[in-house]
């Protein structure tokens, strides 16, 4: 908990800071990157040139490659155990139980992502009850980091895309356009996010498409415009995906998360997370 408070302060500073910022934070256990894969400390955004940006993206690729290897090497029974523990934590969490509208990813086995199937089926299995949650899932619009979050009511609404990830068709079986989060007039309470690597300061490394960062920034702008409360952004992580604090290279476009769900439980990061978790 003490650690979480330190991270809250640091994370708040990072969220507000227009500069690249690799704070010095007390080291926590978990997975260490070798010195060769540690990020270079970056300077201010204004003085950033493309060469420096290239260097950060290069570091990101190195971290991705390291984590992909550790995920591939994970023992299958440990993976199953961790999938169960993480999903149980989510399903029993008050912030999950109370949420009315959420965006969640459809996990993909071949990408070694934390399984979300139990969470999704729990959401979709009570279509008529009062506790029904509105579920939105990603739909990749193009290769320029554009993604939408579309409403689904059944797993049958999904088909595999070219990346072999299940997603809804933007038009349903009746030929109607699906409701889209950015067009919808109700706020989202919760985002359940995928990613390749995370740290306990709120940094998240995606798969390199920029889809989530672009989407989350747009959603935050819309929430601000509408006066909506910001949603809770929670990522799910296997133990090898949790890196030493500060080892994830970031640019100002990277959106920080509020909390991590790990096999050992929830790691609240921001004050918003600490209040609701
Ligand atoms: N389940 C899930 N759905 C998602 C995402 C995700 O990360 N997970 N996305 C999140 O953005 C978006 C899709 N973006 C994706 C970006 C890259 C890859 C992918 O297969 N990457 C390979 C490497 C490919 C390469 O380097 O050329 C990999 O990570 O192994 C998949 C989805 C929307 N839907
Ligand atoms: N050298 C570079 N200079 C500028 N932009 C780049 C560079 N390399 C990649 N990009 C762009 O940055 C974006 C990817 O950013 P980043 O690596 O932070 O994504 P991510 O965090 O993995 O993705 P997501 O948000 O989907 O989880 C893409 O739009 C990509 O085109």
Swiss-Prot record:
Transit peptide: 1-48
Reactions catalysed according to its record: (6S)-5-formyl-5,6,7,8-tetrahydrofolate + ATP = (6R)-5,10-methenyltetrahydrofolate + ADP + phosphate
InterPro entries listed in its UniProt record: FTHF_cligase, FTHF_cligase-like_sf, NagB/RpiA_transferase-like
GO BP: any one term: tetrahydrofolate metabolic process
E.C. no: 6.3.3.2
Keywords of this entry: ATP-binding, Ligase, Mitochondrion, Nucleotide-binding, Transit peptide
Binding site residues for ATP: 60-64, 206-213, 254
Enzyme class, spelled out: ligase
One Pfam short name: 5-FTHF_cyc-lig
Principal location listed in the UniProt entry: mitochondrion
Disruption phenotype: Reduced growth rate and delayed flowering.
GO cellular component, one term: mitochondrion
One term of GO molecular function: ATP binding
Summary of pH dependence: Optimum pH is 8.5.
Record function comment: Contributes to tetrahydrofolate metabolism and photorespiration through the regulation of serine hydroxymethyltransferase. Prefers the pentalutamyl to the monoglutamyl form of 5-formyltetrahydrofolate.
Family (UniProt): Belongs to the 5-formyltetrahydrofolate cyclo-ligase family.
UniProt subunit comment: Monomer.
The protein's name in its UniProt record: 5-formyltetrahydrofolate cyclo-ligase, mitochondrial
Organism: Arabidopsis thaliana (Mouse-ear cress)
Gene name in the database record: 5FCL
């Amino acid at each position: 908990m003490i650690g979480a408070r330190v991270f809250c302060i640091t994370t708040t500073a990072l969220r507000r800071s227009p500069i690249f910022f690799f704070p010095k934070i007390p080291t926590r256990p978990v997975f260490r990157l070798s010195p060769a894969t540690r990020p270079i400390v970056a300077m201010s955004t204004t003085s950033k040139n493309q060469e420096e940006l290239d260097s950060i993206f290069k570091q990101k690729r190195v971290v991705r490659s390291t984590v992909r290897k550790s995920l591939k090497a994970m023992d299958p029974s440990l993976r199953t155990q961790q999938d169960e523990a993480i999903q149980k934590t989510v399903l029993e969490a008050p912030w999950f139980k109370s949420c009315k509208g959420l965006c969640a990813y459809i996990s993909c086995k071949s990408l070694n992502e934390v399984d979300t199937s139990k969470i999704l089926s729990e959401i979709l299995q009570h279509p008529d009850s009062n506790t029904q949650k509105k579920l939105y899932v990603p739909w990749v619009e193009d290769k320029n980091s554009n993604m939408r979050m579309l409403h689904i009511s059944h797993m049958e609404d999904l088909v595999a895309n070219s990346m072999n990830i299940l997603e809804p068709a933007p038009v349903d079986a009746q030929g109607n356009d699906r409701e889209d989060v950015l067009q919808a007039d109700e706020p989202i309470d919760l985002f359940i996010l995928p990613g390749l690597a995370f740290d306990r300061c709120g940094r998240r490394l995606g798969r390199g498409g920029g889809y989530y960062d672009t989407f989350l920034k747009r959603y935050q702008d819309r929430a601000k415009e509408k006066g909506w409360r910001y949603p809770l952004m929670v990522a799910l992580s296997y133990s090898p995906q949790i890196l030493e604090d500060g080892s994830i290279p970031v640019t100002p476009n990277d959106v920080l998360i509020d909390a991590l769900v790990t096999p050992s439980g929830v790691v609240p990061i921001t004050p918003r997370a600490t209040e609701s978790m």
